[in-house]
Amino acid sequence: MTRSHRLLLLLLLIFQTAQRLTTADPNDEACLKNLRQNLEDPASNLRNWTNSVFSNPCSGFTSYLPGATCNNGRIYKLSLTNLSLRGSISPFLSNCTNLQSLDLSSNQISGVIPPEIQYLVNLAVLNLSSNHLSGEITPQLALCAYLNVIDLHDNELSGQIPQQLGLLARLSAFDVSNNKLSGQIPTYLSNRTGNFPRFNASSFIGNKGLYGYPLQEMMMKSKGLSVMAIVGIGLGSGIASLMISFTGVCLWLRITEKKIVEEEGKISQSMPDY
């Protein structure tokens, strides 16, 4: 191979490498484009989320999209919290296959949690709390084996908590409080670790139709405290009544004794001296 051929191959390799670095992964591009199309942005917080940026959102570890974090040229974290966003979550979000953290909390997003999230196999953190999400919690979340955090509190989710979520071995934070969930809390989410439940009652409160441990234990403790309070009030009232009665008797005795002394004085004065 001549020197000119080697130089040509080197230039071609450099060109291909540079092209890969400056061109978005087609999956990430589809993910971002569809996510933006499904979201309404009345406060214009996503004004820089444009097609031109979607075609090149990352350069190594540098992100050109507000709310996005890059790792080796791929989107690996999306944090769009408290931006007054509306609309729904696009099922094409699953195209961001390197995504490890998704935080869309404290917005006004409605609709369902798309089952396609199951394809985010690297997902570790899912925070969709404080929105208007409805429908059931998709059991396909259990296929995201690396999930450490599932936070869905303060939504309008209904139905039962999927039993499969209890099989997520890495799950360390779980919160579905203040929804419209019903049925029994899955055993693997409520079982004890030593003397403590895996997730305590605060993870489940605010769901009128939900029952089972640890909610049941909290209610029993609450009832126990109520009974003790009633007994305490009763005892307190009884003691107070006794004290008042005792004080009244003492006063009556003192008044009676005083009258007797006065009467004895009068009698002694009226008797003649001998």
UniProtKB/Swiss-Prot annotation:
Main localisation: membrane
SUPFAM superfamilies assigned: L domain-like (SSF52058)
LRR repeats (start-end): 96-121, 123-144, 145-168, 169-192
Membrane topology classification: Single-pass type I membrane protein
Signal sequence range: 1-24
GO cellular component: plasma membrane
PROSITE patterns membership: LRR
TM region(s), chain numbering: 224-244
UniProt KW keywords: Cell membrane, Glycoprotein, Leucine-rich repeat, Membrane, Receptor, Repeat, Signal, Transmembrane, Transmembrane helix
Name of a matching Pfam family: LRRNT_2
Subcellular location per the Swiss-Prot or TrEMBL entry: Cell membrane
Glycosylation sites: 48, 82, 95, 127, 191, 200
Cytoplasmic topological segments: 245-274
Extracellular side: 25-223
Family under the similarity heading: Belongs to the RLP family.
PANTHER family in the cross-refs: RECEPTOR-LIKE PROTEIN 14, RECEPTOR-LIKE PROTEIN 8-RELATED
Protein name according to UniProt: Receptor-like protein 44
Gene: RLP44
